[in-house]
From Swiss-Prot:
Keywords: Metal-binding, Stress response, Zinc, Zinc-finger
Zinc listed as a keyword: yes
Protein name: Zinc finger AN1 domain-containing stress-associated protein 13
Lineage of the organism: Eukaryota, Viridiplantae, Streptophyta, Embryophyta, Tracheophyta
Ubl conjugation in keyword set: no
Function (record text): May be involved in environmental stress response.
Species of the source: Oryza sativa subsp. japonica (Rice)
Source organism superkingdom: Eukaryota
Biased composition (Polar residues): 66-75
Induction: By cold, dehydration and salt stress.
Example GO molecular function: zinc ion binding
Zinc finger (AN1-type): 170-216
Residue ranges of the region described as Disordered: 48-81, 150-173
Residues binding Zn(2+): C176, C179, C197, H200
Gene3D superfamilies (alphabetical): AN1-like Zinc finger
Amino acid sequence: MVLSGRGMLDGGADDVGLWLGMQDFLVFCESAMYATCPLCGLFSDSPKEGRSGGGGGSEGQRTDSRLQLPTTSIVDSPGKRSLCVRASDGAGERDAGRAAAAPVRERLWLLRLCQHPRPLLQVLPRQPPPDRDVPGAVVIVVHGASRRGTVPEGIPVDEGAMPPPPPPRAKTKSRCAACGRRVGLMGFECRCGAVFCGAHPLLGQARLWLRLQGRAGRDAIARANPVVSADKVDKL
Protein backbone atom coordinates (compact mmCIF):
# COMPACT_ATOMS: atom_id res chain seq x y z
CA MET A 1 0.00 0.00 0.00
CA VAL A 2 1.37 3.41 -1.01
CA LEU A 3 -0.06 6.69 0.29
CA SER A 4 0.85 9.96 -1.46
CA GLY A 5 1.20 13.33 0.23
CA ARG A 6 -2.46 14.24 -0.30
CA GLY A 7 -3.69 10.87 1.01
CA MET A 8 -4.49 9.18 -2.32
CA LEU A 9 -4.80 5.41 -2.41
CA ASP A 10 -2.32 4.05 -4.96
CA GLY A 11 -1.74 0.49 -3.72
CA GLY A 12 -3.94 -2.59 -3.27
CA ALA A 13 -7.35 -1.96 -1.73
CA ASP A 14 -7.34 -5.20 0.30
CA ASP A 15 -4.33 -4.04 2.34
CA VAL A 16 -6.35 -1.19 3.84
CA GLY A 17 -8.48 -3.41 6.03
CA LEU A 18 -5.60 -5.74 6.93
CA TRP A 19 -2.84 -3.27 7.82
CA LEU A 20 -5.01 -0.49 9.25
CA GLY A 21 -7.60 -1.02 11.98
CA MET A 22 -11.14 0.29 11.99
CA GLN A 23 -10.26 3.58 13.70
CA ASP A 24 -7.20 4.12 11.51
CA PHE A 25 -9.29 3.61 8.40
CA LEU A 26 -11.84 6.20 9.55
CA VAL A 27 -9.07 8.67 10.38
CA PHE A 28 -7.65 8.07 6.91
CA CYS A 29 -11.06 8.85 5.40
CA GLU A 30 -11.28 12.10 7.38
CA SER A 31 -7.78 13.12 6.31
CA ALA A 32 -8.84 12.68 2.69
CA MET A 33 -11.31 15.60 3.14
CA TYR A 34 -14.38 13.34 3.05
CA ALA A 35 -17.06 12.89 5.71
CA THR A 36 -17.75 9.46 7.22
CA CYS A 37 -21.20 7.87 7.01
CA PRO A 38 -22.96 7.44 10.42
CA LEU A 39 -24.58 4.17 9.26
CA CYS A 40 -21.76 2.08 7.87
CA GLY A 41 -18.67 4.09 8.90
CA LEU A 42 -17.47 4.60 5.32
CA PHE A 43 -16.75 7.99 3.76
CA SER A 44 -19.40 9.53 1.50
CA ASP A 45 -19.08 11.28 -1.84
CA SER A 46 -19.36 14.89 -0.70
CA PRO A 47 -16.26 16.43 0.97
CA LYS A 48 -16.41 18.13 4.35
CA GLU A 49 -17.33 21.76 4.39
CA GLY A 50 -14.42 24.08 4.89
CA ARG A 51 -11.78 21.59 3.71
CA SER A 52 -12.49 21.46 0.00
CA GLY A 53 -10.69 24.70 -0.78
CA GLY A 54 -7.04 23.73 -0.92
CA GLY A 55 -5.11 24.97 -3.91
CA GLY A 56 -7.55 26.76 -6.21
CA GLY A 57 -10.77 25.93 -7.98
CA SER A 58 -9.61 23.73 -10.84
CA GLU A 59 -6.91 22.02 -8.80
CA GLY A 60 -9.32 21.37 -5.91
CA GLN A 61 -11.79 19.77 -8.27
CA ARG A 62 -9.09 17.51 -9.70
CA THR A 63 -8.02 16.53 -6.18
CA ASP A 64 -11.59 15.65 -5.22
CA SER A 65 -12.08 13.51 -8.32
CA ARG A 66 -8.76 11.73 -7.76
CA LEU A 67 -9.41 11.08 -4.07
CA GLN A 68 -12.92 9.79 -4.63
CA LEU A 69 -13.30 5.99 -4.34
CA PRO A 70 -16.66 5.22 -5.96
CA THR A 71 -18.40 2.07 -4.76
CA THR A 72 -21.76 0.40 -5.22
CA SER A 73 -24.34 -0.28 -2.51
CA ILE A 74 -22.84 -2.14 0.45
CA VAL A 75 -24.57 -4.99 2.27
CA ASP A 76 -23.94 -4.56 6.00
CA SER A 77 -25.79 -7.66 7.18
CA PRO A 78 -27.81 -10.47 5.53
CA GLY A 79 -31.19 -9.12 4.41
CA LYS A 80 -30.28 -5.39 4.93
CA ARG A 81 -28.75 -2.98 2.45
CA SER A 82 -26.91 0.20 3.37
CA LEU A 83 -28.08 3.65 2.32
CA CYS A 84 -24.60 4.68 1.09
CA VAL A 85 -24.87 4.54 -2.71
CA ARG A 86 -22.26 6.23 -4.86
CA ALA A 87 -21.99 6.44 -8.63
CA SER A 88 -19.00 4.88 -10.36
CA ASP A 89 -17.14 6.21 -13.37
CA GLY A 90 -15.69 2.94 -14.67
CA ALA A 91 -15.36 -0.79 -14.12
CA GLY A 92 -11.89 -0.50 -12.59
CA GLU A 93 -12.94 2.10 -10.03
CA ARG A 94 -16.04 0.06 -9.16
CA ASP A 95 -13.95 -3.04 -8.45
CA ALA A 96 -11.51 -1.01 -6.37
CA GLY A 97 -14.37 0.42 -4.29
CA ARG A 98 -15.82 -3.02 -3.65
CA ALA A 99 -12.46 -4.38 -2.55
CA ALA A 100 -11.92 -1.41 -0.23
CA ALA A 101 -15.33 -1.83 1.42
CA ALA A 102 -15.13 -5.63 1.82
CA PRO A 103 -12.97 -5.80 5.00
CA VAL A 104 -14.94 -3.00 6.67
CA ARG A 105 -18.23 -4.72 5.87
CA GLU A 106 -17.00 -8.02 7.30
CA ARG A 107 -15.80 -6.39 10.53
CA LEU A 108 -19.09 -4.56 11.04
CA TRP A 109 -21.03 -7.77 10.46
CA LEU A 110 -18.89 -9.70 12.97
CA LEU A 111 -19.29 -6.87 15.49
CA ARG A 112 -23.08 -7.08 15.25
CA LEU A 113 -22.98 -10.85 15.73
CA CYS A 114 -20.85 -10.51 18.86
CA GLN A 115 -23.14 -7.85 20.35
CA HIS A 116 -26.36 -9.81 19.75
CA PRO A 117 -25.57 -13.56 19.84
CA ARG A 118 -28.31 -16.05 19.09
CA PRO A 119 -28.71 -19.39 20.91
CA LEU A 120 -27.84 -22.43 18.82
CA LEU A 121 -30.54 -24.62 20.37
CA GLN A 122 -33.94 -23.55 21.64
CA VAL A 123 -34.50 -24.69 25.23
CA LEU A 124 -38.05 -25.96 25.80
CA PRO A 125 -39.67 -25.75 29.25
CA ARG A 126 -39.64 -29.09 31.02
CA GLN A 127 -42.92 -30.34 32.47
CA PRO A 128 -42.92 -31.75 36.01
CA PRO A 129 -43.52 -35.53 36.32
CA PRO A 130 -46.92 -36.71 37.66
CA ASP A 131 -47.32 -37.31 41.39
CA ARG A 132 -46.83 -41.04 42.07
CA ASP A 133 -47.11 -40.89 45.87
CA VAL A 134 -50.92 -40.74 45.91
CA PRO A 135 -52.26 -44.34 46.15
CA GLY A 136 -55.36 -45.33 44.21
CA ALA A 137 -55.37 -42.25 42.00
CA VAL A 138 -54.68 -41.67 38.35
CA VAL A 139 -53.31 -38.34 37.13
CA ILE A 140 -54.51 -37.32 33.68
CA VAL A 141 -52.36 -34.74 31.89
CA VAL A 142 -53.92 -32.96 28.92
CA HIS A 143 -51.58 -31.13 26.54
CA GLY A 144 -52.81 -27.99 24.83
CA ALA A 145 -56.13 -26.21 25.26
CA SER A 146 -58.79 -28.00 27.30
CA ARG A 147 -62.00 -28.89 25.46
CA ARG A 148 -65.50 -29.31 26.79
CA GLY A 149 -65.88 -32.59 28.65
CA THR A 150 -62.16 -33.17 29.27
CA VAL A 151 -60.39 -33.20 32.60
CA PRO A 152 -58.14 -30.17 33.33
CA GLU A 153 -54.42 -30.68 33.54
CA GLY A 154 -52.95 -32.19 36.71
CA ILE A 155 -56.26 -33.13 38.48
CA PRO A 156 -56.17 -36.59 40.18
CA VAL A 157 -59.10 -38.83 39.21
CA ASP A 158 -60.21 -41.76 41.33
CA GLU A 159 -60.41 -45.12 39.57
CA GLY A 160 -63.76 -45.96 41.23
CA ALA A 161 -65.43 -42.88 39.76
CA MET A 162 -64.54 -43.81 36.20
CA PRO A 163 -67.26 -45.75 34.30
CA PRO A 164 -66.48 -49.39 33.45
CA PRO A 165 -65.54 -50.19 29.87
CA PRO A 166 -68.38 -51.46 27.64
CA PRO A 167 -68.61 -55.25 27.22
CA PRO A 168 -67.23 -56.71 24.00
CA ARG A 169 -69.81 -57.12 21.28
CA ALA A 170 -70.70 -60.71 20.48
CA LYS A 171 -69.77 -61.82 17.00
CA THR A 172 -72.78 -63.02 15.03
CA LYS A 173 -72.57 -65.89 12.57
CA SER A 174 -73.34 -64.77 9.03
CA ARG A 175 -72.27 -67.82 6.97
CA CYS A 176 -73.92 -71.15 6.34
CA ALA A 177 -72.40 -74.03 8.30
CA ALA A 178 -72.74 -76.34 5.27
CA CYS A 179 -71.52 -74.31 2.26
CA GLY A 180 -69.96 -71.22 3.86
CA ARG A 181 -72.10 -68.78 1.86
CA ARG A 182 -73.21 -65.50 3.41
CA VAL A 183 -76.80 -65.77 4.53
CA GLY A 184 -77.56 -62.34 6.01
CA LEU A 185 -81.17 -62.01 7.09
CA MET A 186 -82.33 -65.03 5.04
CA GLY A 187 -80.49 -67.58 7.16
CA PHE A 188 -81.99 -69.30 10.18
CA GLU A 189 -80.33 -70.52 13.33
CA CYS A 190 -80.89 -74.00 14.65
CA ARG A 191 -81.16 -74.96 18.31
CA CYS A 192 -77.74 -76.56 18.10
CA GLY A 193 -76.19 -73.11 17.40
CA ALA A 194 -75.44 -73.54 13.69
CA VAL A 195 -76.72 -71.22 10.95
CA PHE A 196 -77.99 -72.63 7.65
CA CYS A 197 -79.12 -71.17 4.35
CA GLY A 198 -82.22 -72.09 2.33
CA ALA A 199 -80.42 -74.77 0.26
CA HIS A 200 -79.18 -76.61 3.35
CA PRO A 201 -82.00 -76.38 5.84
CA LEU A 202 -81.06 -79.16 8.23
CA LEU A 203 -77.73 -80.92 8.25
CA GLY A 204 -75.56 -82.68 10.76
CA GLN A 205 -76.46 -82.36 14.39
CA ALA A 206 -79.60 -80.37 13.62
CA ARG A 207 -81.09 -83.18 11.54
CA LEU A 208 -80.08 -85.77 14.11
CA TRP A 209 -81.64 -83.73 16.88
CA LEU A 210 -84.89 -83.32 14.98
CA ARG A 211 -84.91 -87.01 14.09
CA LEU A 212 -84.58 -87.98 17.72
CA GLN A 213 -87.25 -85.53 18.70
CA GLY A 214 -89.58 -86.85 15.99
CA ARG A 215 -89.04 -90.47 16.95
CA ALA A 216 -89.74 -89.76 20.57
CA GLY A 217 -92.87 -87.86 19.60
CA ARG A 218 -94.13 -90.64 17.40
CA ASP A 219 -93.60 -93.21 20.12
CA ALA A 220 -95.46 -91.06 22.60
CA ILE A 221 -98.36 -90.60 20.20
CA ALA A 222 -98.47 -94.34 19.48
CA ARG A 223 -98.60 -95.16 23.16
CA ALA A 224 -101.27 -92.61 23.85
CA ASN A 225 -103.39 -93.62 20.85
CA PRO A 226 -103.47 -97.40 20.27
CA VAL A 227 -104.15 -98.64 16.75
CA VAL A 228 -107.81 -99.49 16.11
CA SER A 229 -108.35 -101.98 13.26
CA ALA A 230 -111.88 -102.40 11.96
CA ASP A 231 -113.30 -105.60 10.61
CA LYS A 232 -113.05 -106.23 6.94
CA VAL A 233 -116.16 -105.58 4.94
CA ASP A 234 -117.36 -108.50 2.92
CA LYS A 235 -117.35 -107.86 -0.75
CA LEU A 236 -120.56 -108.26 -2.71
